[in-house]
Curated annotation (Swiss-Prot):
Protein name: Small ribosomal subunit protein uS4
Gene3D superfamilies: Ribosomal Protein S4 Delta 41, Chain A, domain 1, RNA-binding S4 domain
Signal peptide coordinates: none
Native source organism of the sequence: Mycolicibacterium vanbaalenii (strain DSM 7251 / JCM 13017 / BCRC 16820 / KCTC 9966 / NRRL B-24157 / PYR-1) (Mycobacterium vanbaalenii)
Protein family: Belongs to the universal ribosomal protein uS4 family.
């Protein structure tokens, strides 16, 4: 599946949000790249909406075609479309692995999933976009549990808070999905209503 593989810090600076998490280069220069990066640009309504969509796409590592499908699904579901969209994005397996603290970044989580390190309800899943459901159980495979990424995750457990809709159990780092998240449990710096307005045109 296609994905963005360019310089993430540059993209973070362009969108004004840390897409990596703990990106020191972004923290030093949180303004757009280029000689005149600090210059103020008059924001049109469309530009603001488009930028918010791009922030969401690059935060979760989703290409445009797939992101639009997510929006269309969110729009069909009951409730607020923006809340539904974020819930869909949060339920991706790569994001759940990241949220559970088993990877430092979503990009790293995507790689771990793609390399086949996880099972969901006892079945191997190597598709990062796989959507988890309430009561799913995600395990690290036996042959992977003592590899370096998971040893590091055990050593750094607790450095980043785990959201209340997930639980990580024991040394084997089993992830329990107690529920899908409510909007208040999703801490991404997005104004999802701007995305809804963009696609509603």
């Amino acid at each position: 599946m296609a994905r963005y593989t360019g310089p993430v810090t540059r993209k973070s600076r362009r969108l004004g949000v840390d897409l990596v998490g703990g990106d020191q280069s972004f923290e030093k220069r949180p303004y757009p790249p280029g000689q005149h990066g600090r210059a103020r640009i008059k924001e049109s309504e469309y530009r603001t909406q488009l930028q918010e969509k791009q922030k969401a796409r690059f935060t979760y590592g989703v290409m445009e075609k797939q992101f639009r499908r997510y929006y269309e699904e969110a729009n069909r579901l009951p409730g607020k479309t923006g809340d539904n969209l974020l819930r869909i994005l949060e339920s991706r397996l790569d994001n759940v692995v990241y949220r559970a603290g088993l990877a430092r970044t979503r990009r790293m989580a995507r790689q771990l999933v793609s390399h086949g390190h996880f099972t969901v309800n006892g079945v191997k899943v190597d598709v990062p976009s796989y959507r988890v459901s309430q009561y799913d159980i995600i395990d690290v495979k036996d042959k992977s549990i003592n590899t370096l990424p998971f040893e590091v995750a055990r050593q750094t457990a607790g450095e980043r808070p785990i959201p209340g809709w997930l639980q990580v159990v024991g040394e084997r780092q089993r992830i329990l999905v107690h529920q899908l998240p409510e909007r208040a449990q999703i801490d991404v710096p997005l104004t999802e209503q701007l995305i809804v307005e963009l696609y509603s045109k």
